[in-house]
Every structure is written in structure tokens, then in C-alpha cells.
């Protein structure tokens, strides 16, 4: 793990030992880093969270999803690369009070984890009911409020508090890739579960920006905003600005900005070797907005 300053100069490098960083990280309230990781000595990949103390360099495993989903993990099979990628976590968001939101591409499910540092447990899940039926975890699903197509293979799930909402309510927005592929459950037919879901990383009809209103008190979630964006089966990101939205369709090599009416302001296409992992826009004093590109995951 490398630390860089605003000029892009490396100021520190941290050794994560047996753990390998992937996809995403976030700071907790103490300034420590929570990092999505794989254990190089383990039997599976992309299913753990580690904590890095940036002052001391100490590394600690704080979450192993295999311990929370033992029966489900045992039912999964290795992918074509010979890896047991049964969850494929691609996003982590810090909510405070030792709570995090995780996004699982392999299961097309969003997870809320509580009591992260003491005794982690799954508080709820947002996903396709059919996928989790006949498992011990189906009761953890929030109820869908309204008629809409569930997210598929989502990325860049973002937690947003709103002072205008009652306690227990908040927003989650995301890049809904609209893909259903689970190599760890090859018998599962996503086309039967999600209407018009795609199955190929490059060739597909459309992906979407999705925004959910989550009501923990009622145990529900509803789609409050969405619009179509260029298709990307994997990777990709969305970022809400004050009024606009920045969208990166990573496998298409396309990124652009949309206004509050979801009308495209400007779009760019990049030559790419593989994909554009994520795109963010930042404002710097005395300058026009700049785009920062994050390196692809390993």
C-alpha cells in the first residue's frame, strides 16, 4: 500500500504481509485504513477486510466473510482461473460506529456489516430474493418497495446521509452494471432473476445509475432515481457532485458528466489496454474541475 501526496509523489509504502490489496479502501474515524484484501495463504479471494494503522504500519484482519457465510461459501466452486472468488467484494463504505457497507459483485448483493472490530455480523442485505432463497441468509434481505429491476454486478456503491431524512434512512447510489455472472454458482440463471440482465463484459445493451432510499426502520429499500449509461459489464463508477453526476463506463473506455436532469454535458473516450477502473472529479481552487484516474485493480 503506497501513500502519495497531492503532487503524486510517494511518501510512504506499507507492507501488508500475507494480504493483497484489491479494489477499494476507506478511512475509519480514527484515521486508520480499512482495505479490501485477499489472504495469500487462504483458500479464497476478495472476501476479507484488513485494517492498516498508518502511524505504526500494523496490519490486522478485521473481517472474513467466510466466517459470516460458512454454509454459502462451502456450496460455491472455483472459477475458471482456479480461484474461489465466491463474494468478489468491490466497494467498502464507512458509516461510523464500526459499521460498513460492502458491495459483492459475484452475488449482486449489497451488505451492511455492524460491530466490525468486535464481533462482525451481517445487519442486512440488498439483493435478488431468488438468489438467496433456500439459504440461511434469505431472512437478512431488505424488502423491495416498488416495482423495479434489481441491481446486477454493481460497483462503486456510495453511502449518503441526508439531514432531511428521518433517523434510520439514507441513500445508496451506484453504477448498476446490469450483468449477472456467478462462476462460483455456474448453475444459477441470472436471466431468470433479473429482467434484461446481460452476461458479457463488453457486449451489452445498457448499464444504469441507481439510487436507493434505504429505510432500516421499515426494513425496506426503494429506487428513487435512475438513468441509463453506456454499458460496462465490470468495473466502472459513478460520483454525484452538487448537481451533476460523473459516470465511468470502464470496459467501454467512456466517461462523462451528466446534469441534474440526467442530460449528457460532455463525454470522453479513452484508448485503453483493458479498462478505466474508476473516474473521479475534484475541484481545485483557481482551476477548472480535474479528473483523477485510479489504477486498475491487480
Task: Give residue spans per PLM region.
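Histidine-/acidic-rich catalytic cores in large beta-rich domains
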Residues: 1-298
Amino acid at each position: 500500500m503506497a501513500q502519495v501526496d497531492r503532487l503524486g509523489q510517494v511518501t510512504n509504502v506499507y507492507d501488508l504481509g500475507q494480504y493483497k490489496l484489491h479494489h477499494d479502501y476507506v478511512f475509519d474515524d480514527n484515521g486508520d485504513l480499512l482495505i479490501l484484501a485477499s489472504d495469500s495463504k487462504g483458500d479464497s479471494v476478495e472476501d476479507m477486510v484488513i485494517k492498516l494503522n498508518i502511524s505504526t504500519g500494523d496490519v490486522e484482519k478485521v473481517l472474513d466473510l467466510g466466517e459470516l457465510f460458512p454454509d454459502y461459501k462451502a456450496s460455491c466452486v472455483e472459477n475458471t482461473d482456479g480461484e474461489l472468488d465466491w463474494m468478489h467484494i468491490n466497494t467498502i463504505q464507512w458509516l461510523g460506529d464500526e459499521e460498513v457497507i460492502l458491495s459483492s459483485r459475484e452475488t449482486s448483493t449489497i451488505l451492511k456489516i455492524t460491530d466490525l472490530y468486535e464481533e462482525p455480523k451481517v445487519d442486512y442485505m440488498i439483493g435478488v430474493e431468488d438468489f438467496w432463497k433456500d439459504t440461511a441468509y434469505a431472512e437478512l434481505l431488505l424488502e423491495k418497495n416498488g416495482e423495479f429491476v434489481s441491481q446486477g454486478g454493481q460497483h462503486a456503491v456510495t453511502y449518503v446521509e441526508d439531514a432531511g431524512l428521518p433517523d434510520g434512512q439514507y441513500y445508496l447510489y451506484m453504477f448498476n452494471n446490469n450483468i449477472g455472472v456467478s462462476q462460483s454458482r455456474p448453475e444459477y440463471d441470472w436471466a431468470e432473476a433479473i429482467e434484461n440482465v446481460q452476461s458479457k463484459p463488453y457486449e451489452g445493451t445498457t448499464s444504469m445509475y441507481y439510487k436507493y432510499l434505504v429505510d432500516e426502520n421499515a426494513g425496506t429499500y426503494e429506487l428513487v432515481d435512475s438513468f441509463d449509461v453506456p454499458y460496462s459489464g465490470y468495473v466502472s463508477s459513478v460520483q454525484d457532485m452538487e448537481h451533476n453526476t460523473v459516470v465511468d463506463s470502464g470496459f467501454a473506455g467512456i466517461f462523462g458528466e451528466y446534469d441534474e436532469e440526467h442530460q449528457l454535458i460532455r463525454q470522453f473516450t479513452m484508448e485503453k489496454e483493458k479498462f478505466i477502473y474508476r473516474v473521479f472529479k475534484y475541484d481545485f481552487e483557481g482551476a477548472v474541475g480535474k479528473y483523477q484516474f485510479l489504477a486498475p485493480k491487480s
